[in-house]
Amino acid sequence: RLSLHGGHWQLSGSKFYTTGALYADWVDVSANNPDEQRVSVTVRTNDPGVEIIDDWNGFGQTLTASGTAHFREVPVDPLNVILAENRFRYSPAFFQSVHTATLTGIGRALAEETAGHVARRTRSFSSGNAPRVAHDPQVLQVVGNLRSAAYAAGAIAAQNFQALERAHQAHLNDDEHALSHAVNIAELEVAQSQTIVSDLIIKASGDLFDALSASATLKPLGLDRFWRNARTLSSHNPRIYKSRIVGDFAVNGTPPPAQWRIGVA
């Protein structure tokens, strides 16, 4: 909450999912002002009263520092407070598109790493199709599917950013009608993308083991990290809700929500 004390603004409260805050110099915090308006507040991570705790213990995205942050009467410069409605309107879609891009990166990394393991592998199965696994057509098919999944995810992510660019241009042109339309379309494109890209990369992160052997499950290789990271990212904003929102727009013309928030009942 943002409150006024002795003529000076102060920020107080706690939140979880402070992704990246541990590595940042500044953080952007959503809060309510005394008029119960939603505002965006920017503070330094080393300001008095700011405490970032490294307590994220999820099984994936382990280095994202997505843990707890406490703000205890943190002094706030009035210049660093803006109404949420005055931020760039396509910000939710912009931030969500980062998840799609990250999933794409996971897909590319797992495809490349799997191909490398297959190329170097010397052991084979008696029921295989070639003396070397690198020449086994069934194994090559698996690797090809992994690479194709990563490519498809990347193409979808690029399409997302084109929609965001159109929203950005409408924002620069100060065209309210065009902006509202472009923001809604960007939100929908990102929502549609997340459901498909999540499916592609989560599946690929399990399928990669079909191209390898039981030794691929050894902990030092860490190949399970691709699934853990993809699954964690895809759980951040449940894709079942994204599909419902897209369907509601397709059937009823209902625009997507302007903000994504997590709260308690």
Language-model segments: what does each one mean?
Residues Y17-A21, F95-V98, L233:
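Glycine-rich phosphate/pyrophosphate-binding beta-alpha loops
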Residues G58-G154:
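Glycine-rich beta->alpha junctions and the first turn(s) of the following alpha-helix
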Residues Y17-E51:
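A short core secondary-structure module
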Residues I106, E113, N145, A149-A152, ...:
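Charged, amphipathic alpha-helical oligomerization/scaffolding segments
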Residues A152-I196, G206-A214:
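C-terminal helix-coil-helix/basic helical segment that borders enzyme active sites and/or dimer interfaces
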Residues R1-L22:
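Glycine-rich flavin
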Residues E112, G116-A119, A155-A158, Q162, ...:
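Charged/polar positions within long, soluble alpha-helices
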Residues D210-A265:
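Glycine-rich phosphate/cofactor-binding loops in nucleotide/flavin-utilizing enzymes
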